[in-house]
């Protein structure tokens, strides 16, 4: 490994901590960036924390805000989505975030054809691009590998970005969990703005049955191939952050989350040495 790994903490890794405690956790772990979310009750940003407060707390500790997670479902464009996008883009700008994560519709009841889904994606990107430009932030598109998702693969997103002239404001989120679930083989390091990492250790569960609740910290028992995915991205030129995003309650309930994340960091450093 020719370059040091750059780690970040997604708010999902420790959703029960206060914002100051979460920032302190990042500092202690020598992670110089965080991601905040709009889907966690009781913490920022759902608790009404002003964006300026987030900016000030992070700046005081040398922490960068990578993103807000997430605009959903970004690829179903309507007046409600526009209002959500404007609100989140303003918050991202004001808190100093680099960008806004955008997740596609994940609904088994979505009866749209592939052509209709593709048209919806291109419409959304066309509408979102000027909003992102106006607010000076990036849009991080995160395909979800679940079978029912309207945008499963990064190749589809890349083609839509290029077709709509959005290369200046759109980047991909390479999520190691969703990359594995989608059975993807392609990597797009030149368009990857952020990497989400989490592990799965349940070897018995059928692939199609694996959900967010299976996602733990990356360790020896990981079946997603996190180290191999990260190595492939780094070898192809990716130099951005690796952001921990485990959803499992077993992680959220850990008595010593700092030690657990530290062990995962050490594991990845050793695996990628």
Placement of each model-derived feature along the sequence:
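Histidine-acidic metal/acid-base catalytic patches
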Residues: 1-8, 16-32, 59-62, 90, ...
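Active-site beta-loop-alpha junctions enriched in small/polar residues
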Residues: 10-14, 37-41, 70-73, 105-107, ...
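Residue-level recognition of alpha-helix initiation/capping sites
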Residues: 16-17, 48-49, 83, 123, ...
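Active-site acidic/histidine proton-transfer and metal-coordination neighborhood
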Residues: 20-24, 57-60, 76-172, 256
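Short beta-strand segments at enzyme active-site cores
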Residues: 35-36, 65-68, 98-105, 139-142, ...
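Alpha-helical scaffolding within the catalytic cores
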Residues: 49-54, 87-88, 228-229
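The substrate-binding groove and active-site-proximal loops of carbohydrate-active enzymes
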Residues: 71-79, 216-219
């Amino acid at each position: 490994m020719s370059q040091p790994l750059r780690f970040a903490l997604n708010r999902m890794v420790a959703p029960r901590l206060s914002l100051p405690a979460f920032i302190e956790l990042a500092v202690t772990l020598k992670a110089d960036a965080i991601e905040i979310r709009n889907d966690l009750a009781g913490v920022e940003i759902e608790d009404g924390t002003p964006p300026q407060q987030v900016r000030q707390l992070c700046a005081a500790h040398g922490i960068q805000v990578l993103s807000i997670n997430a605009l959903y479902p970004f690829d179903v464009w309507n007046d409600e989505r526009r209002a959500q996008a404007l609100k989140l883009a303003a918050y991202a700008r004001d808190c100093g975030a680099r960008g806004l994560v955008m997740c596609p519709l994940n609904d088994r009841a979505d009866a749209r054809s592939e052509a209709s889904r593709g048209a919806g994606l291109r419409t959304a990107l066309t509408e979102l691009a000027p909003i992102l430009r106006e607010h000076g932030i990036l849009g991080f598109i995160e395909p979800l590998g679940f079978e029912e998702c309207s945008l499963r693969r990064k190749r589809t997103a890349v083609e839509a970005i290029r077709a709509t002239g959005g290369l200046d404001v759109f980047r991909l989120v390479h999520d190691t969990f969703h990359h594995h679930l989608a059975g993807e083989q392609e990597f797009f390091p030149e368009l990857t703005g952020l990497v989400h990492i989490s592990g799965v250790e349940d070897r018995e569960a059928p692939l199609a049955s694996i959900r967010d609740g299976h996602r733990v910290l990356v360790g020896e028992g990981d079946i997603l191939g996190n180290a191999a995915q990260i190595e492939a991205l780094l070898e192809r030129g990716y130099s951005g952050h690796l952001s921990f995003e485990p959803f499992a309650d077993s992680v959220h309930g850990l008595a010593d989350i700092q030690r657990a994340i530290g062990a995962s960091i050490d594991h990845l450093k050793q695996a990628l040495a």
